[in-house]
Amino acid sequence: MEMERINDDTIRVTISSDDLNERGVTFLDLLDNHKEIESFFYSVLEEVDTDHQFASNDAVTFQVLPNRNGLELYISKNPTDGMEEAIKSVSKDNAPSNGEMDEVSDFLKRKLAETDSNDKNNDDSSYMSDGNPADLNGYANGVGSTQKSVIELEDFESLPSIAELIKTNSGIESVLYRYHDIYYLELTFFTSENSPETIKNDLAIAYEYGNSTIVSSEVLREHGEVVMDGAALELAKRYFK
């Protein structure tokens, strides 16, 4: 683990995959438990802030960005409006694509901001669509040039398993939701870039690790938690091999 001072108010900590393993922390832990994230970040702060300039500051903030070898954790006190641009500037050499960077960073920031007020207490029956469960011959519930399907995953580990087998390209959008402690994968296929046979084969792969569901995309967008937005398969393939 390496520490670099960016300016008087910001330090960058480079955390490799080996560093995570030594601390018994995985990417899955960081994605699954916001208290685990907070505890891990403060333990890093305690380790690198030997002169206690940051730990004693109530306004300390964390921002995490993935790099090609692990994570970069930025710890700032008295953050300013220009902090984010400074972070992007110093991290650009090691960072993956902007889309990947934003997906992981935004998710971890959302997890840190979670409160108990996010708990869902509504009647489950109001969350369900009126349609029948999807099957491989009825995967098209999209409109126009897209075809959409929602798969209820057996567990989080199902996502990287699916990602390893489905060829990801610009013709598929994938969103991972969590709703009532169950993970759902929404796949949107662009019909101009995928043949009916390709879509059917990809869905067959997905259903090996999940089940059809009557929970609709609309329900997930309104009541669920977005875990990975737009490129869930790509992110899973990159970070959960």
Curated annotation (Swiss-Prot):
InterPro entries per the UniProt record, alphabetical: MecA_C_sf (IPR038471), Neg-reg_MecA (IPR008681)
One GO molecular-function entry: protein-macromolecule adaptor activity
Region annotation Disordered: where it falls in the sequence: 115-141
Family: Belongs to the MecA family.
Role this protein plays: Enables the recognition and targeting of unfolded and aggregated proteins to the ClpC protease or to other proteins involved in proteolysis.
Subunit structure: Homodimer.
Comment, domains: The N-terminal domain probably binds unfolded/aggregated proteins; the C-terminal domain interacts with ClpC.
Protein name: Adapter protein MecA
